[in-house]
Curated annotation (Swiss-Prot):
It comes from Rickettsia bellii (strain OSU 85-389). This is 3-hydroxyacyl-[acyl-carrier-protein] dehydratase FabZ. Involved in unsaturated fatty acids biosynthesis. Catalyzes the dehydration of short chain beta-hydroxyacyl-ACPs and long chain saturated and unsaturated beta-hydroxyacyl-ACPs. Belongs to the thioester dehydratase family. FabZ subfamily. The lineage of its organism: Bacteria, Pseudomonadati, Pseudomonadota, Alphaproteobacteria, Rickettsiales. Its EC number is 4.2.1.59.
Length: 145
């Protein structure tokens, strides 16, 4: 099952310039998800990071991983219309390859553990089949107030 950008925008609240998942290419609810982010030179972060040699900031790669995980949560629960997903912890992030405009980030997230409203994930970003980044993180799912 694929999920296009229109449905992604129904599932998570992020918008330009902070929406960092372009498409979901595979999903197994309650287990894992794979998506893509096409990195383009016209994104605002490249104005300052770095003008002479644009490089995707590592923190935005982690953000893309967490957004993909939030989509997995929404599909696993059936909906997150009345829920909010909050990041609680980021652990063991490693950045192994420079990501730059023209690259396609292949992002994968797996649910490692779910207890009540706390979910733990492992995630990777690959470019051209090579590991670019990896991280583990924890999120809390809360009812909207």
């Amino acid at each position: 099952m694929t999920i296009d950008i229109t449905e992604i925008m129904d599932l998570i609240p992020h918008r330009y310039p902070f929406l960092l998942v372009d498409k979901v290419v595979e999903i197994d609810p309650n287990k894992s998800i794979t998506g893509i982010k096409n990195v383009t030179v016209n994104e605002p972060q490249f104005t300052g990071h770095f003008p002479a040699r644009p490089v995707m900031p590592g923190v935005l790669m982690v953000e893309a991983m967490t957004q993909l995980a939030a989509i997995l949560v929404a599909k696993s629960l059936g909906s997150t219309k009345n829920k909010e997903v909050f990041l609680m912890a980021i652990e063991n992030s490693k950045f192994r390859k420079v990501v730059q405009p023209g690259d396609t980030m292949h992002i994968h997230a797996t649910i490692d553990q779910q207890r009540a409203n706390v979910w733990k994930f492992s995630s990777t970003v690959k470019v051209d089949g090579e590991m670019a980044a990896e991280s583990k993180f924890t999120a809390m799912i809360k009812d909207k107030s």
